[in-house]
């Protein structure tokens, strides 16, 4: 018989041997799992041999050395999940989210008997949820959202005694919600939105005594809300929106103390229960797009913590209770598309935090209250389609943050207040279909960020002001059905972004030649005016139908069906004999004056003394050369090589210029920028600024090579960039769009940041760019970024601030603080740069179809879904999506609402420099031909110890790391970004 100590030793030895065998098996299991993945070479390169506990994403138990956790999230892995995963008996956590995995979830996953967390979200997994999942008795968190899973939700999930989080959102699941799942005593989070679930909401829902989050949005659930809903006292978020639920909203729903109650997009009828006014914890109340009727309960004014109140798209009647003015934290109030009546309550003036007010399509009457101007943070005001009367309050100019103002389809009268032109940030102004009279104020031209202007169907008189030509961002102008006269201003031809122009049914005279340079114009209607002359057939006019010109008997052109005859026997003389005699006498006098001037001796004019008010000289404009790249060219050469700046050499348009490509033998191409306006008034002042700009040299700035200024035209000469602008690469059509991999995007971001950092911190004088955008980031043949158009920016003054006379920049990129105050500093550029980062990350435009990219990212961030917006080209080429998240974080830091919360461009460079991988030394001719990483500017040298391929390596530095920078500026990927 074996002695007891010997037996104990024997059992211990056997246990150790079993552990050793298990450990060895875990290593081989991981290698088998790797075989089922694709795109592993660059991310799982260390999964080859040796100590697997040191492999990427692997965490082992400190005692047994068995695999305890596997985290391969965000690595862009393809392929499938191997059934071998079931052999990891000791694994506690599996995180494979945000990859490109496909296929089915293997049944063997149920053999991971120790598993507590399983996260397979944001992949392309399909098939059913395996019933074997119900074997995971220790599972606490099961997250399978954002896949392609089908079938029913297994009722056996109710047998998981420790399940706290179940998130199956955004799949293709069908059937009913298993009733047994409502009896899970520990379940806290149930996310089922975005599936095809049917059936009703069970009365057993309140058996989930620990449940605080219940989201079934975007399904096909039917029936009423259970009367027992008031017993779900632990609920904090209840989202039943966009289903087919019906019946009335139960009275006892008011017993809930939820922060979010979303019932929109259903078929609820009846009145809004007054008891909802007792739900003091409500931050979001959304009852929109139902069939609710009756008045708005005045008791809702008690909801002093509510930030968003949505009631649009119902059948609500009666007046707006003035008590709503007590909702002191309200940001969004949407009451549009109802049958509300009465006056707009002046108490709304107390809602100083209101951001969006929508009262459209109701029956409101009376004047617009002056108190609205007290809503100083109001960004959007829509009162379209009511019965409002009186005049437009001039006090609206106090709404400095306003971007959208729509007062159309009312009975407003009087003139357009000139004060509206002081709302600097306005991008949409719609006053159409009213009874407004008087002229269009010329000051409207100061709304330089306006995208849409609609003044149609009023009683406006006078001329179209020439100042309209200052609206360089404008895309749509509608002045139809008024009494406007005069000519179409020549300045309209400077609107390079104009896509729609409607001037029909007015009394406009003259011709249409001024519109020939509106190259973006797609829709033109000048019908039923008094226009005359030839309709051009070149440029963009060939795209317009004859209907665009109807009702103008004086217009002619072969494709309009009327020939342009210079004279005829039957025609009346166009001018009188007396006028002809006067013209002849005047011409003779002018001829005599010219002869006297020619015969009189004079000295040749000196170019630099020419001013705009002096006559144009016959001497060719002088070409001022700032760098040797232009040393062999003269003005005549450039005109010859571009055939006097012929259209066929045009490579781009800007808000203030047209750009041509000038190519000659044995020289690098040159970009010639022709400014639209002959500004500034003082050539000497402008020359001084250009010479200062020409002296600025940096590898990430486009060099100004020379210039030519004269009353006949102002030309600037720059280095030519082979790959155009970043805008072109990201946003042009499919035929032109170039796919950018992640590394290239990172290097573009770093290069642009280095150029901007040089302007802000190392340039003398230091410069604010004022218009940072993807169109002003040019790419050379190696896709290295070069910042352009910094040349006409003002130098930073000693106080580091500057008050401009008008807001500069481009819609979508403008710092909201700058737009509100017109006070400019370096942080305004940082904000714009952050928007460019978002473009690089998403491939989306800053503003597209009225969708604001920054607002989109903020909303996705609030839902922890920001990675859904990543450009697919990044997902295909990025080795570590964690880097993408860090750049998202950096972009949101740069776009913080408070300028003081944003980093400097030096700090931005340091963060990006940690993410960009240094190029290895070239080993072949092919490698030598590849673009090399830009040299780091001198101001980075002090941070050389920060070099590394990840934030972790940077954070180990004794210097300030990017991780510490993130801490310094606050947590960004949260709901409190702004």
Curated annotation (Swiss-Prot):
CC per GO annotation: membrane; plasma membrane
Upper taxonomic lineage: Eukaryota, Viridiplantae, Streptophyta, Embryophyta, Tracheophyta
Originating organism: Oryza sativa subsp. japonica (Rice)
KO phenotype (gene knockout): No visible phenotype under normal growth conditions, but mutant plants cannot survive when grown under heat conditions (42 degrees Celsius during the day and 35 degrees Celsius during the night). Reduced plant height and reduced panicle length.
GO molecular function: ATP binding; protein serine kinase activity; protein serine/threonine kinase activity; receptor serine/threonine kinase binding
GO BP terms, alphabetized: heat acclimation; regulation of cell growth
SUPFAM superfamilies listed in its UniProt record: L domain-like, Protein kinase-like (PK-like)
InterPro entries on file: Kinase-like_dom_sf, Leu-rich_rpt, Leu-rich_rpt_typical-subtyp, LRR_dom_sf, LRR_N_plant-typ, Plant_LRR-RLKs, Prot_kinase_dom, Protein_kinase_ATP_BS
Keyword set, alphabetical order: ATP-binding, Cell membrane, Glycoprotein, Growth regulation, Kinase, Leucine-rich repeat, Membrane, Nucleotide-binding, Receptor, Repeat, Serine/threonine-protein kinase, Signal, Stress response, Transferase, Transmembrane, Transmembrane helix
Enzyme Commission number(s): 2.7.11.1
Identification of the protein by name: LRR receptor-like serine/threonine-protein kinase ER1
Family membership: Belongs to the protein kinase superfamily. Ser/Thr protein kinase family.
Membrane topology, as annotated: Single-pass type I membrane protein
Annotated transmembrane regions: 578-598
Main location: membrane
Domain Protein kinase residue range list: 645-916
PROSITE patterns according to UniProt: LRR, PROTEIN_KINASE_ATP, PROTEIN_KINASE_DOM, PROTEIN_KINASE_ST
Residues linked to a glycan: 62, 71, 218, 231, 302, 326, 371, 389, 406, 454, 507, 525, 540
Catalytic reaction list: L-seryl-[protein] + ATP = O-phospho-L-seryl-[protein] + ADP + H(+); L-threonyl-[protein] + ATP = O-phospho-L-threonyl-[protein] + ADP + H(+)
Gene, per the UniProt record: ER1
UniProt topological domain (Cytoplasmic) ranges: 599-978
Active site residues per record: 771
Annotated Pfam families: LRR_1, LRR_8, LRRNT_2, Pkinase
Residues annotated for ATP binding in this entry: 651-659, 673
Residue intervals on the Extracellular side: 25-577
Matching SMART domains: LRR_TYP, S_TKc
Primary role: Receptor kinase involved in the regulation of thermotolerance. Functions as a positive regulator of heat tolerance. May be involved in the regulation of cell proliferation and cell growth.
Gene3D superfamilies, per database record: Phosphorylase Kinase, domain 1, Ribonuclease Inhibitor, Transferase(Phosphotransferase) domain 1
